[in-house]
Amino acid sequence: MHVCCPPVTLEQDLHRKMHSWMLQTLAFAVTSLVLSCAETIDYYGEICDNACPCEEKDGILTVSCENRGIISLSEISPPRFPIYHLLLSGNLLSRLYPNEFVNYTGASILHLGSNVIQDIETGAFHGLRGLRRLHLNNNKLELLRDDTFLGLENLEYLQVDYNYISVIEPNAFGKLHMLQVLILNDNLLSGLPNNLFRFVPLTHLDLRGNRLKLLPYVGLLQHMDKVVELQLEENPWNCSCELISLKDWLDSISYSALVGDVVCETPFRLHGRDLDEVSKQELCPRKLISDYEMRPQTPLSTTGYLHTTPASVNSVATSSSAVYKPPLKPPKGTRQPNKPRVRPTSRQPSKDLGYSNYGPSIAYQTKSPVPLECPTACTCNLQISDLGLNVNCQERKIESIAELQPKPYNPKKMYLTENYITVVRRTDFLEATGLDLLHLGNNRISMIQDRAFGDLGNLRRLYLNGNRIERLSPELFYGLQSLQYLFLQYNLIREIQAGTFDPVPNLQLLFLNNNQLQAMPSGVFSGLTLLRLNLRGNSFTSLPVSGVLDQLTSLIQIDLHDNPWDCTCDVVGMKLWIEQLKVGVLVDEVICKAPKKFAETYMRSIKSELLCPDYSDVVVSTPTPSSIQVPSRTNAATPAVRLNSTGTPAGLGAGTGASSVPLSVLILSLLLVFIMSVFVAAGLFVLVMKRRKKNQSDHTSTNNSDVSSFNMQYSVYGGGGGGGGGHPHAHVHHRGPALPKVKTPAGHVYEYIPHPLGHMCKNPIYRSREGNSVEDYKDLHELKVTYSSNHHLQQQPPPPPQQPQQQPPPQMQMQPGEEERRESHHLRSPAYSVSTIEPREDLLSPVQDADRFYRGILEPDKHCSTTPAGSSLPEYPKFPCSPAAYTFSPNYDLRRPHQYLHPGAGESRLREPVLYSPPGAVFVEPNRNEYLELKAKLNVEPDYLEVLEKQTTFSQF
């Protein structure tokens, strides 16, 4: 059976043709793309295929190899394009070797920023004949050698900022005859070599953020005659005589050429002031200015720029007090009279510099232009670096800030000095939020409305000097959280309220000199890191340490000169605080004005105890040697001064003689003091010991002299009358037969002791016999003695006579029964019979009485007196009229060694061993050989003068 195919319809045929056409189109597109890619790779090179994206625009290829981790240039190959920009920033290149760019002849811009390049070897840029811009910013370069940039003869733009460059060799830019823009900001340059720019046609130079203090005219500035933009900010400029040439040169170039300010860092009297505000007399007050001035120059011109005469943006400066005493209001600025003012036009880069071809890199330094609106009465210029507008309205007789029309757009700096402004209102700066500097000096401002600066959050410098402000309050500075420099000198300020500076925590410089301040509130500087404070020329008599001076922990310089300081107790704490400041911190000496004795005297030179004689105690902690360093902004150790409730010192400890003492001297001094103390202590110890020994020796010798002054000898003979010489210290062996007794005078008048003139002590041997003798010995209640008087003896019957073994002379007869009476009455003398001083019954000792030598002292005769009756003369000792007037009896008791001393008859008896009694009977036991000699001396009477001399001698003793 035959089956035929179904007929093909028109619709199906159309569908097939469309499908086939789509396949062909897709195949063609793929083929074209492949061919195109192959052609691109073949045209741009491998760098655009594998490593980096490439983009061609306006006949220029941009090769973006940024942040690819490239360590060496061997990892990439040069693109195959006539002109290209090679961007290699953000990689890891550390060194550039010779001839590494020899095949990159088409490069016109080379970005090598943000790598870690430390060295560029000679010939590294060979082959870059067409390079016009080179970026080496944010690397680690330290040196630019003479041959660093060899091969870059056509270079126009060089950026090497944010490195560590401290040295530039003199010919480093000598071959760069086309260089116009040089950016060297934020390095470590402290100076530039002479003739560095001699063959370089620079028009833009950025030297911000280095360590430059001077820029000489000869050899440097004289070769920069084509500069149209210069940036010198953030350098520690030394505003001295050497900077006069820079000031003259800046005045000779275009007013708009200087971008930013040249702010003085030193000296302190000019710190924080712009160079164009400082007169030459202030820069060089003691030398001839003409020696430092720049030589006259012809007006300079720069292609493509309209030049105007420099407008002086002067602010009346505080004159140096070292030359003359400044008036109440400072003089006007030193702007040259009749100097024409020409309003400068905004600067636009000329086309012949080729900036339009620099691409995005030119935006690194400049931005798109902004509308320029300037008040009619002022002159303005645009600061290209930050597109800030500088508005100069100096000396325009402006009475109100509201008169400035039209309002300037985004002003960065406004100079309104030398006008007639009296009030600053809240609405005056509503549209100036980006303001960095506001100069209102030398007006007539007497009132500033609360929060008038509330919208100026970016303001860093505020000049209110030379006005009529009388009071400062916290509301005045509200909103100025970024303020760093505040100038309030030459006003009428009498009062500063507590917390005035709380809204300005970043304040570093405060000038309050030449006002009428008498006191500062407690805590006025709390929370601040002030580096420089000027209080010169006020009415301070003292400043408390607590709450004021102790909060100034970061000071670099402070000026307290020209105040009527009252050098009394109130300034003791301040003086001690000043003495602990480091050298150079205090500007000029603090001079006393009162009291009169200290007038015109340096406070440091006066000892603290002289300032405050009636001091109590002031405790000051001495700074450690590390505090000699320049204070930082962190809180350092502050002097601890103990003060009273008023904040003034309570008194004084020890005055310090110097503001600082080297550590070595301090250690040596302490060592010497320690050694001296040891020697002094040893000497005192030896002296005390010698005195103690001497006292003991004197006491012993005195006792010996008291005993030996009675030349008495005692002898005890054994049985049978055996002889032996007696001795005062001889021991008694046994009792023998009675020996003959001899009554003798004292032998010589000097052997008696006169009556004492007074009591020496309570010791009985030094007590007088006047008055009740028994009462004189009441302290000796523990001793037992007995006494009896002559009257008692006379009432007793005489004993029977006893025949002695040897017949003595009549004067030497012993009374019968004497031994028995001695047993009962213990040593009775004609005047008194004093018993032996015996110990207590419970402390009996077989040792004989040690005080036996004090008994038996001579007794005055009752019938012969040498002193007339009724005479006022002192009673002198009595002497016997004849030897026969004496009756002898033994006045001591001899006992065997084994016998004990017996107690006395009662406690009421006299208990006194007589020492200072008048001469009386002396009972001795002479030996046989001395008997005749002793007998011969019985008839000797002493001379009266000898007696008187002896009494005087003992009175002195």
From Swiss-Prot:
Positions with biased composition (Low complexity):
623-632
UniProt keywords (A-Z) are: Glycoprotein, Leucine-rich repeat, Membrane, Repeat, Signal, Transmembrane, Transmembrane helix
Q: Name one Pfam family in it.
A: LRR_8
Q: Which residues are glycosylated?
A: N103, N644
Q: Where is this region: Disordered?
A: 317-358, 623-642, 789-844
| Summary of the tissues where the protein is detected | In the adult, significant expression is detected only in the brain. In the embryo, expressed in the subventricular zone, cortical plate, pyramidal layer of hippocampus, thalamus and hypothalamus.
Q: Could you give one GO CC term from the UniProt record?
A: membrane
A Gene Ontology annotation in the biological process aspect, one of them, is:
striatum development
Q: What span is annotated as the signal peptide, if there is one?
A: 1-40
Extracellular topological intervals? 41-664
Identify its membrane topology class: Single-pass type I membrane protein
Q: Which domain of life is it from?
A: Eukaryota
| UniProt similarity note | Belongs to the SLITRK family.
What does the UniProt function comment say about this protein?
A: Suppresses neurite outgrowth.
PANTHER family per the record?
A: SLIT AND NTRK-LIKE PROTEIN 4-RELATED (PTHR45773), SLIT AND NTRK-LIKE PROTEIN 5 (PTHR45773:SF5)
Give the protein's recorded name: SLIT and NTRK-like protein 5
